[in-house]
Amino acid sequence: GMPIGKTAKLDWKKLIADTGLKVVSIHEDLGSILRNPQEIMEEAKTFSTKYIVITGMHRFDYSNMAAVLELAQKLNKAGKILKEGGISLLYHNHNCEFRKVGAGKCAYDVLIEKTNPEYVNFEFDSYWATEAGVDTIALMERLGERMKLYHINDRGTRMSGPGGQILKSDSMELG
């Protein structure tokens, strides 16, 4: 979930080339996209990917309707800029987007409804939706073609100690 280069001083391009792997997407933060869209698009192109994924907002109140509406607006703006450069913007969920913001709606509902499918689509993470108690199959059906990537991992049942604001239980290693 960290932007490239923030996880140590590794030569990611060389590592990827040496292993023959393909980069499906890169993660970026919304502020960087809005401040430096050309730089971000060039980075995506150097990895031969068409997807830039925003993995949520740090210290963001997903229970605040005005804030969520503003987020949708900013996502649309960033997505439009990226689309003009041949890149697609995806939003990756965690459990916090499923907090209620009003009458029967959660923040994720608002993001689906208020973002333009031409500019913003989704990398759906079923682990976090399940953690939030969401009917993941129904939500995947609702997203339909807007679900461009699917992030799947095993869901643990052990409770963990202190962690970030998102994590509530341990994930389990696949395999």
Predicted regions and their residues:
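Glycine-rich, proline-tolerant flexible connector loops at the mouths of alpha/beta enzymes
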Residues: 1-17
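Mobile, glycine- and charge-enriched loop segments
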Residues: 13-26, 145-147
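Acidic/histidine-rich catalytic cores of soluble enzymes
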Residues: 83-175
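Active-site acidic/histidine proton-transfer and metal-coordination neighborhood
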Residues: 22, 28-121, 142
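A short alpha-helix capping/helix-coil boundary motif
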Residues: 17-22, 56-59, 161-165
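Short, contiguous strand/loop micro-motifs
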Residues: 1, 26-28, 64-66, 98, ...
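Short beta->alpha connector loops
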Residues: 2-6, 28-35, 57-58, 127-135
